[in-house]
Every structure is written in structure tokens, then in C-alpha cells.
Amino acid sequence: MQRSKLKEVRGTKDLLGAEFYKFQYIQHLSQAIANRYGFIAVDTPIIEFTEVFTKTLGDDSDIVTKEMYNFQDKSGENITLRPEFTSAIVRLLINKNLVTPVKLFSSGPVFRYERPQKCRQRQFHQVNFEFFGSDSPLADVEMIALGYNILSELKLLNNITLEINFLGDKETMNSYRLSLVEYLNKYKKDLSGDSQRRLITNPLRVLDSKSPEDCEILLNAPNIGDFYTKYSSDFFTEVLDGLNDLCIPYQLNNRIVRGLDYYCNTVFEFTTSELGSQNAVIAGGRYDGLVRSMGGNDTPAVGFAMGIERVSALIDYEHKESRNVVLVPIGKDAMSYALKLAYELRCKGISVGWNYKNTGLKNMLRKINDNSIVLIFGDEELKSNTVQVKDMKTGEQQEVEKGNLLDALYNKI
């Protein structure tokens, strides 16, 4: 293999040391909080049949047209590395005939072929939350509250804004779509190429454009709130009232539509100004028609995903290493005893390391970090059934009988 290929693929990143522990902390904290809200953890493969995503994300979405990693396997099946979780979780819900209402938590890597930049990679990681089986506005409020709860415990609320919009029911969206198309057609030649295409295939997606020329045109675009039916207006009012009751601050943003076709009614993002253009830390909304569109029952649903890389870039986290035990056997017989002692201590839940070679006491101690507890033993200790316990942090050393060793270590770890 060429040396140039022996490195990370562009848009991917190795995780180790402090960064790995930060990722693990975010994931574990998110799952622990999800447990309080009644979620159960599930896992799906990172590969799915391509149809799982093309059938749900929208033929004109950026993910389907530009970003999915597709390939044919050796049997000729069209396979895709998952670009998002929700479609795969819905597939699981249908395949396993899960009884609703049910709340599902998942996490792991997702893959999109995008131009790598700060907080945007081709392989990145998400924690994902899906609530199937409730059409109540209060379910939307609770999901937003869950995201807010997680960001609060990550100590990020000072840097975060909750932005929310309401796309409405079918009647609302159809009326608004006609008005938006009528408005945008006046400026069709001035729109970006992507927006000209979306104007034909999915006009609401134009609202999602970050192009400066599009943003200028959209300043005077119709407001979807002017087209709400009574159902839509009442639903959104109840969502906002719920957020007010929980003292969760928010900003209305009628430009939020989300980039996937399955969203309806409530859509929201938790954003920050500290990550440049990749400003959404959490994003989600309601997708009541998705389960039915994939062949399942008519099942209302609401959910969101949180980007671990983006959260990791915002938080300060110092992993606290637990103190480990290092064996320093002196002599051949002590080496044999070390193998047995290491096994016994590990079976009792203690982290143990040793060198497997006798390179001299001073030399071995020099290579041990200050957070360790060292067990030194040679011929004399083997005869008296004792161990010398040295605390590298304090320099204190004491002789401990083998029968009291566990208690001595538990007191120091």
C-alpha cells in the first residue's frame, strides 16, 4: 500500500485520549437523561438498503442528490451508509412490530459526502431521539425540553438559542406553497441555481437556502403563519404555551423548514454563534407521515438529533483518570506471582498493569506516572505473604499483608 494512503480518509477523524473521553461523556450523559424521559436504547446497522433513505428523505434533498455513500454489494444489492438515523429507526419500528407509544434512543456514526470544514465531517456522530405514537403538542414540548435539559447539563445554555417554526398541516402547507411559488417566480432569474431547481421540485426548501442572493429575496417572502388553519394555529399555540410554562426561551424563525422532506408541523433547532456556518447543535421536529410512507401504520412521531462533534467543540471537559495499580515484581518467582496477582485484582474490578520484564526497581519506578499505586514484591515479600504498597502521588510506602491488600487499595483508588 502506498504511504500516502496510510492516513485518515478526508473528512474522517481518529478519536483517542481526551477527545475520545469527551465524546463518550456526551453520549453517556445524553443517554442517562433520555432514560429519565422513558427512552429505551436501540441500535441499527450503519448500512441499509438505499431505498430506506431515497423513499423518505426526498428525491431533491441534498442528502439524496449529493451526499449519500452508495454502493452495490457482491450480490448486486444497492446499499447506503446511513446518512441519518430517523429513516433507519422507522424501518426498525416497522420490522420489529414495536408497540406504540414508544421512545427510542440511538447513537453512532453517520456518513455524508460533504466538503469538510469546521464541525462538518464526512463521518460524524449523533445521539438521536425518536418518540412514536403521540400527536399531542405536549409531546413536542417534552422533546424540546429533553434537548434543553441535555444542553443545560452540558453547561451550554449561555451560548445557545432555541429557534422554532411551525410548518402546519397539509392545508396550511399547500396554501403557503402556492403563495411562496407565486412570490419567488417574480425573482426566478435572480435565485441561485439550487433554489431555481428547488422552486420546481420542492419550493419550501428554498427557505433553507444560505445563498446571499436568496436570503435577500426571502426577506419579503410570505410568512407561513398567515396561512395557518385553526388546527395549525391551535397546535402551535399549545407548543409555545408549553415552552413558556417550562420557562424555556425561544425565538420564532419562519425560515426553518429542515432539509428533509418528511418534516411537518413543529420544526426546531438549537443554534450557536460560535461554530460559524455549522450553527445547529440540535435539530428536529415532527414527522407524522413518515412511518406510513415506509409501509407501516399511520403513526405520529417527533424527534431530534444532536451532533456530538459540534457539542464537543463547545464544552470544556476534563476526564478524571481513576488511579491504576502497577505491579513491580523483583525476581523470577515474583514474576510468576505477578501474573496471578494481576488476574485476581482485575477480577475484583481493579485496573492493573505491569511490565512483564524485570528491568530493575529504580528503572521501573521511573516509568510509572504519579497517579499510580505501585505494588512492589520480591523474595522476602513472597515468604512473608506481604506486599510493599507505594503511593506515587504522596511518596508514602507501607508493608501490607496479602489478606488486607484489597482494603488498602480500595482506600486509595
Curated annotation (Swiss-Prot):
- Tell me which EC number(s) this protein carries: 6.1.1.21
Q: Which domain of life is it from?
A: Bacteria
The main enzyme category here is: ligase
Q: Does the keyword Ligase apply?
A: yes
Q: Which GO terms describe its cellular component?
A: cytoplasm
| GO BP annotation list | histidyl-tRNA aminoacylation
Matching Gene3D superfamilies: Anticodon-binding domain, Bira Bifunctional Protein, Domain 2
Family matches, as SUPFAM superfamilies:
Class II aaRS ABD-related, Class II aaRS and biotin synthetases
Q: Which UniProt keywords apply?
A: Aminoacyl-tRNA synthetase, ATP-binding, Cytoplasm, Ligase, Nucleotide-binding, Protein biosynthesis
Q: Molecular function (GO) terms listed?
A: ATP binding; histidine-tRNA ligase activity
Q: How does it assemble?
A: Homodimer.
The entry's family comment says: Belongs to the class-II aminoacyl-tRNA synthetase family.
What name is this protein filed under?
Histidine--tRNA ligase
Organism annotation: Ehrlichia canis (strain Jake)
Q: Supply the gene name.
A: hisS
